[in-house]
Amino acid sequence: MASNQNQASYHAGETKARNEEKTGQVMGATKDKAGQTTEATKQKAGETTEATKQKAAETTEAAKQKASETAEATKQKAAEAKDKTAQTAQAAKEKTYETAQSAKERAAQGKDQTASTLGEKTEAAKQKAAETTEAARQKAAEATEAAKQKASETAQYTKESAVTGKDKTGSVLQQAGETVVNAVVGAKDAVANTLGMGGDNTITTKDNTTGATTKDTTTTTRNH
């Protein structure tokens, strides 16, 4: 009985020992595995950290390079824009100068043309005025000469008409006077003859042509 118990204890002890050994092995293996895992994890973490650090450095370097390139491009574009602005300003300045110069030249040409045209018009006006004045003077001279000629002709005609009229008037008056005298003498003679009277009768007449007074003496014989 005791022998069985001892054997059982022995077996239990072996089993326990084997279990403990196995457990120890397992634990050791687990510990080794855990250590390996931890080391691998540490190594992986280190590698990851290094990779991350390297990646960050690369990213930072790329960002710096990109920023530098961007800054350089911006600087270059700014310089190009500045040059373009300067060129545009210079072109505008030259264009403004050319426009002003052209306007100045056109104004000078217009002034010269205006002065020339004004001079020509003034000269033409002077010539026209001189021609008009000369024509008016000549016309006035012709009119004056014609008036003088007409006045001379009129005066001559009036003078001749006056002389002719005077001659005609004198002749008519003389004839009328003679007729009247003859009529008076005839009437006187008739009366004297009728009354048987006779005598001398003197009749005074005026010559209207010469203004002289004449006497007409008629002798009448009285019949006894």
Curated annotation (Swiss-Prot):
Leader peptide range in chain numbering: none
Ranges of biased composition (kind: Low complexity): 200-224
Region annotation 12 X 11 AA tandem repeats: where it falls in the sequence: 26-153
Compositionally biased residues, Basic and acidic residues: 13-23, 41-85, 92-109, 120-151
Induction note: By abscisic acid (ABA) and dehydration.
Repeat is among the record's keywords: yes
UniProtKB keywords: Repeat, Stress response
Domain of life: Eukaryota
The keyword Transferase belongs to this UniProt entry's keyword annotation: no
Sequence repeat intervals: 26-36, 37-47, 48-58, 59-69, 70-80, 81-87, 88-98, 99-109, 121-131, 132-142, 143-153
Region described as Disordered: spans on this chain: 1-169, 193-224
GO cellular component labels: nucleus
Family (UniProt): Belongs to the LEA type 4 family.
PANTHER family the UniProt entry points to: DAUER UP-REGULATED-RELATED (PTHR47372), RE19971P (PTHR47372:SF11)
Name the record gives this protein: Late embryogenesis abundant protein, group 3
Taxonomic source organism: Triticum aestivum (Wheat)
